[in-house]
């Protein structure tokens, strides 16, 4: 009996799973079958085909780029080269991502916010100015009622903010919540409001003159005075300014319209990495008023050449009817864990003043109400429960001991002794950080400033010093 030979077509199909020698015309007719028998990432090995055969391609590379040769028509595949397809694919991806990434370029992050121009007027500032974000003012009276010591006037803070809003651009028509929205505060405006607390009085008054002259309107001076009263009321009610303000970024560009401004700032990374859009000043260095800049290493004769940290520091004086707030940018080689001891040495007088006078004007507890721990009475009485050293860890014996619950009203606490608070802003990574002291012209007013070059923003959290 004669046997029929096996069909050869399945063998041809099986070979196509290993060898990729099928021409364009044959491949076009069996595209679905080809996807089943040969995965897209299979390599195509073998000699280069001649004639009307398609050029060999590396399927793994095409798969990584997201290109499937079977999805394109034979005419397109014959006219376009693999390299051209790959370049087009890369360019399309880069265009969707927003641009090509240059290897080794510094990474930075931009942030943007629309704010009122009452406390931050970008047209009067320059690129590189420091900006702070302020918590919504409606939260402050509630915080005052929870944090103010007994006897303090909590309504003082609400009245101060109400008077500030009356002098603002939207004072005649407040928001539906009864207060303006949260916004930004320029560091220069904050320094001008605290001008009376700085030792360099002439430089601080120059900053105040710049704000009152260039912020526009006749109510700029009134806003400064009322904002200064708000800061004093915050210290009085223990709603410290550092608890309602945070670092926003270094000013880069802005767009203003009427009493609103859209502000763009660098919140992380090098300040000078982005373009400002101004031909005269394409890059922005950090600019700080000279009265609010402290070189801590030079003040305390510490350290030598090397990289330095930048800190934002608030200082407070808690004395009845003499509350003061001050803000600084401190440069030091000390890390955050070692800065508190240096600030204690620099602002030691404030620390002593707050420890002595911070508890004034507070309602004391009633007399003879658990003022002192009755150790002598308990020791003399044989009826008082006792516990040996071996029974301290046993709740059965510890719970029987006398419980002393003193009334701490009128006594010094950590908040009454708080004299400063600091947060890390960033670093100056150069071995010899450049701090240029000069006088900059803001309109018709000359202001002594310090220009910090090479600042890399790296903001951190707040730490209170008491």
From Swiss-Prot:
The keyword Ligase does not apply. GO terms for cellular component: host cell nucleus; viral capsid. InterPro entries: Herpes_1. GO terms for molecular function: DNA binding. Pfam families: Herpes_VP19C. Signal peptide: none annotated. One of its GO terms (biological process) is viral capsid assembly. Keywords: Capsid protein, Host nucleus, Virion. It comes from the Viruses. It is found in: Virion; Host nucleus. Residues 1-29 are annotated as: Disordered. Structural component of the T=16 icosahedral capsid. The capsid is composed of pentamers and hexamers of major capsid protein/MCP, which are linked together by heterotrimers called triplexes. These triplexes are formed by a single molecule of triplex protein 1/TRX1 and two copies of triplex protein 2/TRX2. Additionally, TRX1 is required for efficient transport of TRX2 to the nucleus, which is the site of capsid assembly. Interacts with TRX2, MCP and capsid vertex component 2/CVC2. Belongs to the herpesviridae TRX1 protein family. This is Triplex capsid protein 1. The lineage of its organism: Viruses, Duplodnaviria, Heunggongvirae, Peploviricota, Herviviricetes.
């Amino acid at each position: 009996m004669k046997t029929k030979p096996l069909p050869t077509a399945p063998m041809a199909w099986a070979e196509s799973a290993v060898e990729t020698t099928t021409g364009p015309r044959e491949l076009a007719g069996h595209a679905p079958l080809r996807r089943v028998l040969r995965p897209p990432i299979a390599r195509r090995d073998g000699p280069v085909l001649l004639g009307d055969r398609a050029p060999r391609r590396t399927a793994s590379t095409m798969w990584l780029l997201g290109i499937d040769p079977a999805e394109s028509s034979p005419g397109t595949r014959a006219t376009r080269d693999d390299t051209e397809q790959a370049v087009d694919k890369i360019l399309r991806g880069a265009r969707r991502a927003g641009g090509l990434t240059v290897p080794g370029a510094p990474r930075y992050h931009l942030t943007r916010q629309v704010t009122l121009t009452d406390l931050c007027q970008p047209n009067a500032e320059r690129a590189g100015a420091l900006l702070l974000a302020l918590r919504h003012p409606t939260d402050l009276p509630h915080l005052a009622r929870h944090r103010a010591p007994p006897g303090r006037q909590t309504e003082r803070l609400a009245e101060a903010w109400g008077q500030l809003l009356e002098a603002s651009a939207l004072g005649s028509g407040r928001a539906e919540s009864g207060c303006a929205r949260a916004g930004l505060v320029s560091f220069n405006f904050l320094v001008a409001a605290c001008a009376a607390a700085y030792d360099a009085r002439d430089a601080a008054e120059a900053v105040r003159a710049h704000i009152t002259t260039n912020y526009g309107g006749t109510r700029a001076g009134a806003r400064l005075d009322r904002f200064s009263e708000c800061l004093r009321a915050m210290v009085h009610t223990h709603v410290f300014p550092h608890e309602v303000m945070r670092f926003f970024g270094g000013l880069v560009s802005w767009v203003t319209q009427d009493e609103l401004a859209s502000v763009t700032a660098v919140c992380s990374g090098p300040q000078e990495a982005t373009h400002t859009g101004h031909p005269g000043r394409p890059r922005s260095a950090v600019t700080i008023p000279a009265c609010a800049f402290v070189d801590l290493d030079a003040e305390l004769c510490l350290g030598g050449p090397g990289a330095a940290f930048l800190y934002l520091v608030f200082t407070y004086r808690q004395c009845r009817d003499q509350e003061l707030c001050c803000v600084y940018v401190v440069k030091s080689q000390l890390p955050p864990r070692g800065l508190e001891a240096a600030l204690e040495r620099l602002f030691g007088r404030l620390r002593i003043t707050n420890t002595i006078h911070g508890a004034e004007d507070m309602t004391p507890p009633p007399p003879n109400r658990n003022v002192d721990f009755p150790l002598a009475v308990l020791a003399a009485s044989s009826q008082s429960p006792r516990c040996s050293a071996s029974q301290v860890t046993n709740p059965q014996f510890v719970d029987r001991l006398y419980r002393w619950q003193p009334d701490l009203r009128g006594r010094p606490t950590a908040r009454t002794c708080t004299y400063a608070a600091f947060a890390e802003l960033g670093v100056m990574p150069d071995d010899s950080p450049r701090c240029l002291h000069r006088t900059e012209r803001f309109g018709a007013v000359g202001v002594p400033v310090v220009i910090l070059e090479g600042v890399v923003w790296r903001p951190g959290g707040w730490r209170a010093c008491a």
